[in-house]
Amino acid sequence: MARYIFITGGVVSSLGKGLASAALGALLQARGYKVRLRKLDPYLNVDPGTMSPYQHGEVFVTDDGAETDLDLGHYERFTGVSATRADNITTGQIYKTIIEKERRGDYLGATVQVIPHVTGEIKDFVLSDPGPDVDFVLIEVGGTVGDIEGLPFFEAIRQLGQELPRGHACYIHLTLLPFIKTAGEMKTKPTQHSVKELRSIGIQPDILLCRTEFPIPEGERRKIAQFCNVRPSAVIQAMDSANIYAVPLDYHHEGLDTEVLDVFGLLDQAPKPDLTRWEEISHRLSHPDGEVNIAIVGKYTGLTDAYKSLVEALVHGGVANNVRVKFDWIEGEAFEKDEDLIAVRLANVHGVLVPGAFGERGSEGMIRAVQFAREHQIPYFGICFGMQMAMIEAARNLAGIRQASSTEFGPTSEPIVGLMTEWTRGNEKQVRAEGGELGGTMRCGAYDAVLAPGSRVAEIYGSTAIQERHRHRYEVNIGYRERIEATGLKFTGLSPDGQLPEICERADHPWFVGVQYHPELKSRPFDPHPLFASFIGAAKERSRLV
């Protein structure tokens, strides 16, 4: 039977529970254990699909089409285990399920309550089949202890601690140790009060993971242990790391995996960890041969968490080419307000990337960025919205279709990009009506694509058959293919039925590729996505020229 590790947070949000969970999962894997990571999100949205990126950050899409929390991206990148819709649940999903059951009469007239019905759904999710031979299931609870929204989740994991066999549950609490510079002191009171709140719910943490800017003095460690009722060795220091891929090494050095195994009584029989690959990647990130500067011209650049997987995929591409990747974040709107700014910001970059986005705001600036990259032979990578902008740019400036636009921006006589109303998933036809609901209506998840033999992308992938994850409502209009291809922008990747353009590229350019899907979602530190490795390789080549 699998053992369960519950990771909670206190004091403030955004301390890094997702990263801590992923790092612990990687450490357990390094000892030969099989792991599965899951996330409980207390918000009332059914999923983050319709949430603002500024509110939630990136929406991470799984192979089976679930729109999930960005922490699942950390889980996949650190463990290599692909997540599914069974690995993320929200209060909105739980309430939706309960109300549907109540309307069907499944509760046989009982009064539906938070306990036992809501907590029961949470426990069912936690205990649902993690897969064959899984040794540890790591459950991250979103938010912080004391949040009203989180109370049913904390109650559910408290109950599970009593219901699971003895020695099959471990509680880790991530907290903050602020350093007051004016006093020159590290303060433990916030941690003490956070643990007090957790214990008032009925949960005694086994391990405290303490985020801190400075090393924890031994006296403070003993003080925390005494007041929080844990052993001093279970007060784990979690300082900022040089890069996130050094976090597993740092946590191992502090003894996190050792303490977890000790809680389960497995320390004496646990295999020694093999952290070789983590040491290698950490070394490569710390000792690059060079540096490339990538301009990301987007819509949500004010919050880099909106592009979390994209940033990591570019870092992975840098690892593949042994270079450090620097980011120049640019709002598309900036190029609309000041055209002269384009040359100032882009002339000396080594690559231009336009990522996914929704809506018209900033689109004209992104189109101008595409044009500049094309005309000045700067490596260009367009992802989802970025591919659509490349198509519109070619249509307007090279094919003479001056009114070329997207129906996402409003009515147009030349819909180069239009709303998808039908597509195929497996053997089922998916249909979306004009003006329908937004939630859960996109073309999401893994879909096949066929690449043109001899094309650049076929060479990059080493295959003409690929499968990538998508998240979009709008698609390039295949009816414009002949006119756009006449400009040199070739459709070199299509859906298996030949109706949906998936990839475009230019042969008359050092590196110019647009893709309708999101390759960043499948990139891993130890297996960089080939498109990102190739793009950064082209940027590295340009860095030698400018």
UniProtKB/Swiss-Prot annotation:
Homotetramer. It catalyses: UTP + L-glutamine + ATP + H2O = CTP + L-glutamate + ADP + phosphate + 2 H(+); L-glutamine + H2O = L-glutamate + NH4(+); UTP + NH4(+) + ATP = CTP + ADP + phosphate + 2 H(+). NCBIfam families: PRK05380.1, PyrG. The active site is at 384 (nucleophile), 518, 520. Residues 293-545 form the Glutamine amidotransferase type-1 domain. It comes from Phenylobacterium zucineum (strain HLK1). GO terms for biological process: 'de novo' CTP biosynthetic process; pyrimidine nucleobase biosynthetic process. L-glutamine binds at residues 54, 357, 385-388, 408, 473. Belongs to the CTP synthase family. HAMAP family: PyrG (MF_01227). GO terms for cellular component: cytosol. ATP binds at residues 14-19, 71. This is CTP synthase. It holds the Pfam family CTP_synth_N. InterPro entries: Class_I_gatase-like, CTP_synthase, CTP_synthase_N, GATASE, GATase1_CTP_Synthase, P-loop_NTPase. Allosterically activated by GTP, when glutamine is the substrate; GTP has no effect on the reaction when ammonia is the substrate. The allosteric effector GTP functions by stabilizing the protein conformation that binds the tetrahedral intermediate(s) formed during glutamine hydrolysis. Inhibited by the product CTP, via allosteric rather than competitive inhibition. GO terms for molecular function: ATP binding; CTP synthase activity; glutaminase activity; identical protein binding; metal ion binding. CTP binds at residues 13, 147-149, 187-192, 223. UTP binds at residues 13, 187-192, 223. Keywords: ATP-binding, Glutamine amidotransferase, Ligase, Magnesium, Metal-binding, Nucleotide-binding, Pyrimidine biosynthesis. CTPSs have evolved a hybrid strategy for distinguishing between UTP and CTP. The overlapping regions of the product feedback inhibitory and substrate sites recognize a common feature in both compounds, the triphosphate moiety. To differentiate isosteric substrate and product pyrimidine rings, an additional pocket far from the expected kinase/ligase catalytic site, specifically recognizes the cytosine and ribose portions of the product inhibitor. Mg(2+) binds at residues 71, 140. PANTHER family: CTP SYNTHASE (PTHR11550), CTP SYNTHASE-RELATED (PTHR11550:SF0). Its EC number is 6.3.4.2. Residues 1-266 are annotated as: Amidoligase domain. The keyword DNA damage does not apply. Catalyzes the ATP-dependent amination of UTP to CTP with either L-glutamine or ammonia as the source of nitrogen. Regulates intracellular CTP levels through interactions with the four ribonucleotide triphosphates.
